[in-house]
Amino acid sequence: MAAPSPSSPPNLLSPPPFRSPEASYFLRTCSNFSQLKQIHTKIIKHNLTNDQLLVRQLISVSSSFGETQYASLVFNQLQSPSTFTWNLMIRSLSVNHKPREALLLFILMMISHQSQFDKFTFPFVIKACLASSSIRLGTQVHGLAIKAGFFNDVFFQNTLMDLYFKCGKPDSGRKVFDKMPGRSIVSWTTMLYGLVSNSQLDSAEIVFNQMPMRNVVSWTAMITAYVKNRRPDEAFQLFRRMQVDDVKPNEFTIVNLLQASTQLGSLSMGRWVHDYAHKNGFVLDCFLGTALIDMYSKCGSLQDARKVFDVMQGKSLATWNSMITSLGVHGCGEEALSLFEEMEEEASVEPDAITFVGVLSACANTGNVKDGLRYFTRMIQVYGISPIREHNACMIQLLEQALEVEKASNLVESMDSDPDFNSSFGNEYTDGMNETNETPSQHQIMFTKWDTGRF
């Protein structure tokens, strides 16, 4: 009897098998959209497109890259999506700033009768209603959730409250809160924030004092309410209660306390808050740093404001704007303009309309007519920023301060090209002349040479 032939050795050069676990792993570790498409191609090649888990991963990962159109293509290939997959697609569209598409998909889900709603469907849809300001549809979804038996879900109720408060329906928000059989800390905080945002401070105080448990978000919401309503003393009193309860503040708490210090006009209190933040390990980031600059400037310590600015590692546009404006307000016009040039050239930060309010204010406060006209033109021609009332007011102040009107007129004539200016500037200026019964001759010469239609 012949001996059996030995089995052939495995091919060590053959690629490893590509099954669902491998595909799932590659999707979890995918780092860009190009990789995702390659993985999807392999999924199709190996006939894995009916794997619901892989399809959901494809939708989730493509949405995380902002590729909702690709996610929709994947979703549309499914014959009978599960409720989970419908929910995922609705959520993906909503979080990627396409709420109307999310709502259309929800309507399609309703009329298709292929899938049943669950308790996660309605919160996602309500968030899409909020993002698109569709309060009418939100009310209809509210009724549909009641009929479907999901109204008592706390997550849904919290989302619904948020919708009503943010869409200016505080009474409806309170009704939802009052009907809740059980309330989480999120429920109480949503209610508190809703009342604060709708300027119902007295009601917010009652809710805050009734809360069975308070976290840093709750305390900060109430402190914010006092600051927003210009009641800084009560903001600090509440912060002391917060310390007694041993609740550590967050960055938003600190920034609100800095604003309260500004409202009090108390440099010493502002310094105390700054020192507290430093001792408790708060990082001097753009948010906190800008608030400190604003506080120090408005409380009269430009030197401290500049110190904070100089030690900041990262600076946002708001940070630059705050420092430039502070310098201009305090009469340091040349330093403000120098800082603006530094922002453009070294920091590569593009200015906005607020930046030029600070720049033009600096020119106006120091009577710098030449640079004022130059920056005004540059704002329009280089950055395409249309003049707003504050810009016009600065230019009126600047030209009124000019001792040599003819010289200012010559500067106007020396502009290289015709900017598309807002006509309100010339009108406001000449109207101001008429109100003061000032002799219009020289001023009118200036605006005749630089046609007021160009403003």
Swiss-Prot record:
- Classification via InterPro entries: Pentatricopeptide_rpt, PPR_At4g14850-like_plant, TPR-like_helical_dom_sf
Gene Ontology molecular-function annotations: mRNA binding
Q: Transit peptide boundaries, per UniProt?
A: 1-19
Listed under GO biological process in this entry are: RNA modification
Spans of the PPR repeats? 51-81, 82-117, 118-152, 153-187, 188-214, 215-249, 250-284, 285-315, 316-350, 352-387, 388-418
Q: Which UniProt keywords apply?
A: Chloroplast, Plastid, Repeat, Transit peptide
Q: Write out the GO cellular component annotations.
A: chloroplast
Pfam families referenced in this protein's UniProt entry, alphabetically? PPR (PF01535), PPR_2 (PF13041)
**Compartments, as annotated in UniProt:** Plastid, Chloroplast
| Chain segments annotated as transmembrane | none
Q: Which PROSITE patterns match?
A: PPR
Similarity annotation: Belongs to the PPR family. PCMP-A subfamily.
Give the protein name, as stated in the record.
Pentatricopeptide repeat-containing protein At3g26630, chloroplastic
The organism named in the record is Arabidopsis thaliana (Mouse-ear cress)
User: Which gene name belongs to this protein?
Assistant: PCMP-A6
